[in-house]
Amino acid sequence: MKSLFKKILILIFICLLPTSKIFAEDKIRIGLVVPLTGEYSTIGDSIIKSTRLALNKINDEKFEIVPGDTKANPIDALKASKALYDQGIKIIIGPVFNESTKYLDELNDVTFISLTNKIYGNPPNVISAGVNAISQFQTIDKFRNLNEIQRTIILIPKSDYRKEIELAI
C-alpha cells in the first residue's frame, strides 16, 4: 500500500510541475480524505503514515498534505472535502471506500483520486486508483494468451461487484 501512495503522490506532483504555482513561494496543498475516526480509523491512520513517508522521500517543503476525516461515510466525506475546498484545495486523495464518493460530484471543481478499485458509477470528478476488474481481466486474458489457454470459466458472485465484473468481461 505504501508504494501505491508514493506512486500516486509522485504522479500528482509531476502533473503539477508545469504550473506556475511550483515556482511561487506558496505551498502546494493536497487534501487527503480518509477515515480517521470510527471502525476504519486504522486504515486511515496507515494511509496518513504512508503519505508522510512518501513526502519525506520527495523531500520538498513546497508540498503540504491536509487531512480530513470521512468517518467512512458519504456525508462526512462530502463535509471533509468541502472544508478542504473552502481552504483552496482542489486536488484530494481519497476517499478509500467507493460508497464515500457518492456525493462528491457536488464539488465539481475538485479532482479526487480515490483509493477504491470500483470504476462503475463514480462521479466524473473521481479517478479510481485501485486495481479494478478491467485491469484484472486484462491480466487474466494476457495470461491465457501467453499460455495458449482456450477455455475459461468465470463465476460471478451476486454482489455489488457483479456489474463491475460484467463490464470488465
Task: Enumerate the predicted regions with their spans.
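Short beta->alpha junction loops
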Residues: 65-76, 80, 130-131, 156
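Extracytoplasmic ligand/sensor domains, especially the bilobed periplasmic-binding protein
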Residues: 91-155, 160-168
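Classical Sec-dependent N-terminal signal peptides that target proteins to the secretory pathway
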Residues: 4-24
